[in-house]
């Protein structure tokens, strides 16, 4: 007979990853993000980069360009609960922010719809991160938990298998 499994959610602190220790020391996942995103450097310190993911912001670099210095840029992912709906005014601000702050190497704006029903801004330079996040929040769109080791969009109810409609 199989023995039942009892998970242990009490991981000893000495077994935490450096990312988890960084979060615990970050004052509620805030850390130095405000200062880091306002600094003149194009990238972020490791601690801020790790925390930025929980705020829906990835630090990336142009892999088509070799050598140093790296061409740093950011990806910002909006979490769209349940995949939508998105109001006309929200689409308008997404489009306006994309036009103003995203430009790929060919000079095109870069916004993408993902297979997880999210929206991503690509090729964002550091000075554009705060205005994009702020502009989205003013219209009820948020990047919080858009990246990193967070629960992302729920595309279907976890209890849907109890639904006669779902099981039809």
Report the location of each language-model feature:
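Intrinsically disordered, low-structural-confidence terminal and linker regions
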Residues: 1-29
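Short glycine-/aliphatic-rich beta-strand segments at the starts of folded cytosolic domains
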Residues: 27, 31-84, 152-163, 168
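Amphipathic, alpha-helical segments enriched in basic
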Residues: 4, 8, 12, 53-55, ...
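Charged/polar, solvent-exposed surface patches and flexible loops
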Residues: 7, 31, 35, 39, ...
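Small-residue-enriched alpha-helical segments and adjacent helix-cap loops
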Residues: 70-168
């Amino acid at each position: 007979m199989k023995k039942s499994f009892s998970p242990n959610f009490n991981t000893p602190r000495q077994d935490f990853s450096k990312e988890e220790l960084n979060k615990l020391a970050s004052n509620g996942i805030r850390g130095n993000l405000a200062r880091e995103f306002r600094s003149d450097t194009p990238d972020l310190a490791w601690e801020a980069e790790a925390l930025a993911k929980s705020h829906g912001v990835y630090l990336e670099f142009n892999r088509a360009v070799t050598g140093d210095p790296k061409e740093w840029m950011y990806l910002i992912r909006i979490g769209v609960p349940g995949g939508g709906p998105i109001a006309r005014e929200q689409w308008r601000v997404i489009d306006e922010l994309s036009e103003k702050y995203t430009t790929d190497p060919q000079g095109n704006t870069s916004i993408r719809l993902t297979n997880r029903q999210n929206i991503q801004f690509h090729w964002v330079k550091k000075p554009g991160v705060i205005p994009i996040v702020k502009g989205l929040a003013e219209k009820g769109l948020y990047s919080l938990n858009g990246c990193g080791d967070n629960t992302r969009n729920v595309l279907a109810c976890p209890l849907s298998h109890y639904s006669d409609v779902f099981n039809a």
